[in-house]
């Protein structure tokens, strides 16, 4: 009886050690994944919008002059401020 209980105890301890090693490896992989995911989540998001015209490029709404206004007559300063204010409210 003693050898049987010793064998069962040994197998139980060996199983616990195996599970401990496996969980340590998976937690290291999880930590790497979480670190990479958090780095991606913290990265600044580009604010682009694509117009529905064929062959149109992405237009960035920033402080620079918009290139899509080139074909039109030069609007007044107040119209530009109104237009840029609306873009800022919509897209941040």
Curated annotation (Swiss-Prot):
Family membership: Belongs to the FARP (FMRFamide related peptide) family.
Coiled coil: none
Keyword Kinase: no
Protein name per Swiss-Prot or TrEMBL: FMRFamide-like neuropeptides 5
Keyword vocabulary terms for this entry: Amidation, Cleavage on pair of basic residues, Neuropeptide, Secreted
Species of provenance: Caenorhabditis elegans
Positions bearing Phenylalanine amide: 51, 61, 91
Role: FMRFamides and FMRFamide-like peptides are neuropeptides. GAKFIRF-amide has an excitatory effect on dissected pharyngeal myogenic muscle system.
Tissues in which the UniProt entry reports expression: Each flp gene is expressed in a distinct set of neurons. Flp-5 is expressed in the ASE sensory neurons, the 14 and M4 cholinergic pharyngeal motoneurons, and the PVT and RMG neurons. It is weakly expressed in the PB and 12 neurons. Also expressed in pharyngeal muscle.
Subcellular location: Secreted
Primary localisation category: secreted
InterPro entries xrefs: FMRFamid-related_peptide-like
Propeptide: 1-41, 64-82
Annotated GO CC locations: extracellular region
UniProt keyword S-adenosyl-L-methionine, yes or no: no
Single Gene Ontology BP annotation: neuropeptide signaling pathway
């Amino acid at each position: 009886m003693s050898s049987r209980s010793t064998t069962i105890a040994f197998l139980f301890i060996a199983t616990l050690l195996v599970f401990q090693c496996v969980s340590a490896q998976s937690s290291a992989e999880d930590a790497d994944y979480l670190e990479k995911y958090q780095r991606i989540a913290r990265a600044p998001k580009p604010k682009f919008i694509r117009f529905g015209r064929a062959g149109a490029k992405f237009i960035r709404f920033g402080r620079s002059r918009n290139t899509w206004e080139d074909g039109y007559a030069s609007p007044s300063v107040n119209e530009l401020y109104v237009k840029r204010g609306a873009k800022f409210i919509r897209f941040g």
